[in-house]
């Protein structure tokens, strides 16, 4: 019986080498490499390396900015949201709409021209490289009396483009969206 086992093993070894010729096989990962995960605080939503949160609290622009600064990730404090692309503008508006579906909401952003009229800047210090003003905006409150309009909101008007921007009086009270860089795990 032992001879039979040795003979069968030798036979299978020789024939399997002929039946299945050796080839170079390279194995690639089944899944593509994923980007590094990022972390946002609880109840915040991530979009392209930043965390966002809608607050349905009616506050003046300054109160909203101060409220945002109370939240932090690492050493960074949140600010009223800055917006740098159409996609980000849509994300912010849709974030608001997902929290208050079907209810039109005007929301504060971090854009303002407090220092010099017509020279807009973001509260987080990022560049003013994108805008989506409504047709007649910014108008610095041509119709407002007596206050100027130095703070910017995403507004909803049935006659305006969805997600368009308007400069408004900073003392008006609206809900707002805060933004902060997300933590990246290395």
Curated annotation (Swiss-Prot):
Native species: Homo sapiens
Source superkingdom: Eukaryota
Key word NAD present: no
Domain annotation C-type lectin: ranges: 47-179
An example molecular function term from Gene Ontology annotations: carbohydrate binding
The protein's name: C-type lectin domain family 19 member A
Pfam families linked: Lectin_C
Keyword Protein biosynthesis: no
């Amino acid at each position: 019986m032992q001879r039979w086992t040795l003979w069968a093993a030798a036979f299978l070894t020789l024939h399997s080498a002929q039946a299945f010729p050796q080839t170079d096989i390279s194995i690639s990962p089944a899944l593509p490499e994923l980007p590094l995960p990022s972390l946002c605080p609880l109840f915040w939503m991530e979009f392209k390396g930043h965390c966002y949160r809608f607050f349905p609290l009616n506050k003046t622009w300054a109160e909203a900015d101060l409220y945002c600064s109370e939240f932090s990730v690492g050493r960074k404090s949140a600010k009223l949201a800055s917006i740098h692309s159409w996609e980000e503008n849509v994300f912010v508006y849709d974030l608001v709409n997902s929290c208050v579906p079907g209810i039109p909401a005007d929301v504060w952003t971090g854009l303002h021209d407090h220092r010099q009229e017509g020279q807009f800047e973001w509260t987080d210090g990022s560049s003013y490289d994108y805008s989506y003003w409504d047709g007649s905006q910014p108008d610095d409150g041509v119709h407002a009396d007596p206050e100027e309009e130095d703070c910017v909101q995403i507004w909803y008007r049935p006659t305006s483009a969805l997600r368009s921007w308007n400069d408004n009086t900073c003392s008006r009270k609206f809900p707002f969206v805060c933004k902060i860089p997300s933590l990246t795990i290395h």
